[in-house]
Structures are given as structure tokens and as C-alpha cells.
Amino acid sequence: LRILPFLLIGGLPALATLESAARETLGAGLDPQQCYRVRDLHFAREDLRFYFTDGYLIFGRPVQGRRVAAVFSGETEGGDGEVVLFPPTVAERRSLAFFTGTPNLMEHFRSAVLVFTDDTAELLERQLKSRGEPVRVEEAGLLMKAQWEPVLRNILESLQVRVIADLLSERPQSEGFFYAALAGRKLGNFDCFYDPRGREQIIVGQVVFRENRTFFDYWTSFVARSFRRRPPAEIPPDYVISHYRIQATLEPDLKLRVVTRARVTPQGPARVLVFQISPRMTVREVRIQGEPAEILQPESLRVNLMRGDGNAAFLVVPARPLEGRREYEVEFRHEGAVVSEAGHRVYYVGARGSWYPNAGLHFARYELTFRYPKELNLVANGEVVEDLEDGPWRVTERLIDTAVRLAAFNLGEYARERISRGNFTVEVYANRRLERGLEPRPQQVLIVPPPQPPWNRGSRQQPNVVPVPIEPPRPDPAARLQQVASEIASALEFMATYFGPPPLKTLTVSPIPGAFGQGFPGLVYLSTLAYLDPAQRPAAVRDEYQQLFFSEILHAHETAHQWWGNTVTTAHYQDEWLMEALANYSALLWLEKRKGPRAVESVLNEYRRRLLRKTEDGTEIESVGPLVWGSRLRVSQAPNAWQTIIYDKGTWVMHMLRRRLGDERFLAMLGQLRRRYQYRAITTDQFRRLAAEYLPPGFPDPQLENFFDQWVYSTGIPALKLEHS
């Protein structure tokens, strides 16, 4: 927990400061004088219903004048509690059954730790008083305080950003959240959330530690009852960021020190701002219009797992409330270790999209200045404005004058290949030296001495076999540099023909250790495996599909993200499959142009095979969940389900859609998709309606509702069985 106070400026009451709110939230603890024996106490948070059948209920002490916590314990003779939840859709009932073995949740629990900023405390107090004067049991309260305060504090540390933001922003209790950590008698510990400000207000799930990894398994997540009766509405962002000016210094020890200035416009009056940044970065100071602001940057395992993007939230409280619809300059000073060395001056950038503060990935313009050791090459998105040496440093200024969602950089000791095609330029960089993880291991060769001459054959002396270490040939990390550059330039040109121009005129491609890639606007991170001669790749990636993936698909897929993910985007996890499926199928369109339809059929057959693989419980990977579950598919029982379903099944959906529309209509639809949703987020249903516009006349599923219900919103792969007699 880090709290950086500002000097109190006249007129701001001390009660409203971030420092006091954080101290009160974590230090309030439980109130032994507010402990009650309860029987048949029940309440509901929309679809979630809780029953405190028999046990003790203790409230937390007030924080900023409001109670935000309570604990129920049924750990007494006959004690018990129960939670009941009936998911409203078949898909969500299947999800719940996948994790719990039952489609409806009716779980008895031993205890419940409650944290809330809604009216839960008042609701429970009213129920207690409605049965006459409630009987306090202070002795039990003292025991519960000793037992449960450490547990409550641990949970509050995870949720304090939201608790304090709600308290300081003075939101009405109707917009507050509710959280329950339950100790189930059969299902173990699990979490229940109700958040009226979320797109899906009800979430039930469980933190799982497995094979040195931590997961949050979403058992179910859906729109709450009262919200289902309303027309769906997007929740507007609290503020908009229109411009970034970032000055970053990379020290010789690889520590990154950054000053970020952002133009922020609150949509309404704001007393607190919530930003996100990589947990590897520490925010040291924030100023708003030059005035110091307070910072709260806690660690929060549970909430970070649920967020699913690797970022962590932090709070900023200005010296005085901000006015709505007015632009402010917010200056952040932050530092951290987001760059590591993979050996031989090959570097890995860990926080590629979150090394500076952001909030919801706004489309913004960027001015970037990087200061770094001059013996290194640093690449980033945007056009170079100035590049000079300053003693031991190199200073590079870049400008991104088109609104994009992310700024990113990479560095190393690089060789470069530059190709221009029409109005676009492709610059591809490769490492000059091989990273440690790709170095071939020395092999032992046994040297046998020559046979003995005839006159010594009577000797019983054994031949002296000598093991000699042999260094195998070292792969060239830039073996395919020219080929990769040429192919990316061709892919960019091919895609621009159908999708329109990419967001930036220069596309920079640079290597990253690992077996993945990532496409940012104007900057692609490409696996170092893609640069190697196929014959010199590690044995683990030498099968037919892996060779095709690293040689033909990966760089085209990341190039396609210039359109799908960076020009057109999505805002919610339910729709993220669209960007990966579109990017991957765009790569296959380019593969088809170069290698023919059979190459695409081979890839699709591999995708089908992977979708039909079995999980530990014997079910097919495809059955873990539908495409629209997005990040929810990262489940502990099948860690690879997310990638297999989102990429492989998503690509199949695009292929089947192409077959329904026909090539000409399908490509025209993709071009219209870019034009209609440029610099906007698209939903799955909007994509369905757009695709339906391009169906041939008389198509039997004119709105594609049956197609999407079967392949996007549901699971299952049809099986064809032929019988003859």
C-alpha cells in the first residue's frame, strides 16, 4: 500500500482526503458492540439471495460515516447460511454446472465476509429491528473481532480502490457495490459480486491456485434481473483522455523513469479519478494543473485477476474537485522495471501496453520522447521528429498525430530492413545476437581411438573412449530478416487494398523473446522464432503446423491488427473474440493468396483437431464455453481453452461466414466494417447485423441469428455419421 499525501489546500475537509479514507478503511475493523445473534435473516442483491439461517452477525466500524463491512459466522451448533442463485440463461447455467456440477447455485456456507458501498448495512439493520429490539452479544463480538479482523483487512486491501472511490466521489448508495466472500460447505471458498455500474452486474467465481499459476474462474456472470427489463445502455466513461506527452528515460540498469502528461476531461464533477497501470510501475507523484494530488496504489490480487488485462488500478484525488467538461493537465511521475534482459543484450518489454497510466484505452494523440543508452536501438510507434546523441545518451522524439489507443516501444541491438510500398513504409528489426533461451546445448560426442595394431592385439587393455563436447551451429537471429520484411510489406499492401489504409504510415516490426506476437498501432512485436531459419528452430516448434505458424501466419496476423484491434476495436470481454478472429482470418486470406486454398484447409484442419482435444475431465476443449465468454475462458481446468476457442474457433466462424456471403460480399463487408466503425468499438451483435447486410438475396437465415446462436453464443460441433446397409 502506497499513499502520497498533498499539502491540504484551504477549504478541503480533512475527512475527504485519500490518506484518511485509506487509513480508516483498513483500520476500522469490526465493532464488538454491533454483534448480534441472528436467525432466519435474509436479503437479496438482485438475483443473489442470502439466508443467514443461524449464527452471529457483526458489523464493521463506520468509514467516512458509513459502514462498509460485516461478517456472518455460522460456526456454532446448528449454525448455517445459504446463497441461492438461478442464472437466467442456458449458457450461464451450463457455465455454473461446468464448475460446480449443478446448473443452479444453492450452497450452504459456514461464514460470509461482506464488503459493500451500497445500503446493505441499513438493510440488515432494518431487518434486525423489524423483529423487535435486537439482542447484542458483545462477548461473541470480541471473539469474532479477534478471529475475523485479519481476514476482513485482507479482503479490504483487495477492494479498497473501489471502496474509497465510492466514498470520496459521493456516489449515491444505489450505485454502490456488494461483495461476499463465502466459505461454502461443498464448494470451498468463493466470491459473489453485485455491481450496478458493471455491464454484467452479477458475478460469481473462485480464485484458484494451480500449477504455479493463479486463476479467477468465472462460474457465472450475467445482467441482473432489474437491468434485464431495461434497454441495454453503455456506461459512459468517467473521463476522456485526448492527448499524451510522455518523456521516458531508460537507465543503464533498465529501470524506466517516466513523466507522463495527459489531457483529461471529466464528464461530470469529479473528486476522485481512477487510472490503471502495470503493477511493475510505481506512481511517485501526480499533479493536476500544477497542484499536487494524492495517490493510492495498492496491491490487489483478486481484482487484478478479475480485470484480466494485467493492469492494476490506482486512485488520484485532486486538491479540489474537478469541473465537468473542462480539460485538465494531469502529470504523473512513475518508474519501474518493465524491461528485462533475455541474455546477450536481447531485451523483453513486459508491460507493453501499460507502462504509462491509462483508463479504458482512449483514442488519443501522442508526443513521445525517449532517452536511452546510445549503444542501443529503441523503436516505437509514431514518426521520428528528432534523433540525436547527448553524451552517453540517445534522445529520440516521436509524434503520433493520428488518434490511437496505445503507445509502445521496444529496444535491443538491431539489424534493420526498410521497404516502402506506395504511401507506406515497413521497417523490420532483428536482434544481432541470439537470446540465451534459443542457444543450442552442447552435445557430447564419444571419440573412439583407432584399432590397435596387429602386434598389440594380445593386450587386454580396454580402448580409452573420450567424450568430447561439440558446439552445434548457432542459429542466426536475423536469418529471415529480409524475407520477413518483404512478406509484411506485401501483407500490409494486400490488406490495405480491402480494408483501407492502416492507422499510421510507418509500420515498425521488432523481435520479442517468446512464442507470441502483439500488434500495436504502428508497432508489432514479433516472436524471435519467426526470424530463425525453420531448420534451426527448437525441436518443440518443428512440427508442420508450428513451422507454418512462425513462417507464414504470425507476422500476417499481427499486421492485420493494424485494422482489427487498433482502428476498429471492442470495449467488452464478450466481443474480444472478434478482433482476434478477424486478424487471424485476414492472415489466412493472405496465406491463400500466396499458397493457395489447400494451405488454408490444412490450417483449419489443425484448428478443428485442437478444438476437439479433451480436457482433464474428458470433455472437448470447444465445450468449455462459447466465443462470447472471452477472458472467462481462461479457466484453471483448461488453461489453453481461451486461446484455442478465441483464435481457432473464431477463425472457423469467419470462414463459415465467408462461405455464406461469398468472397466478393465477404471482402466488401470487411471494408465496410472498417469504414463504419473506424476509431469506435463494435459489439458482436453489431457485427452480426453488418454481416447480414451482405447476405445473398433469399438466404434462409436473413439476420444470421441462427448462425450466431449456434456458433458464437453456444458450444458444440456437429458430427456427421454415415450408415449404409
Please state what every model-predicted region is:
Residues A224-R228, P232-V259, T265-R271, Q276-R280, ...:
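Hydrophobic helix-coil surface modules that form long, contiguous segments used
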Residues G268, V466-R474, P503, R598-A599, ...:
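Amphipathic alpha-helical substructures
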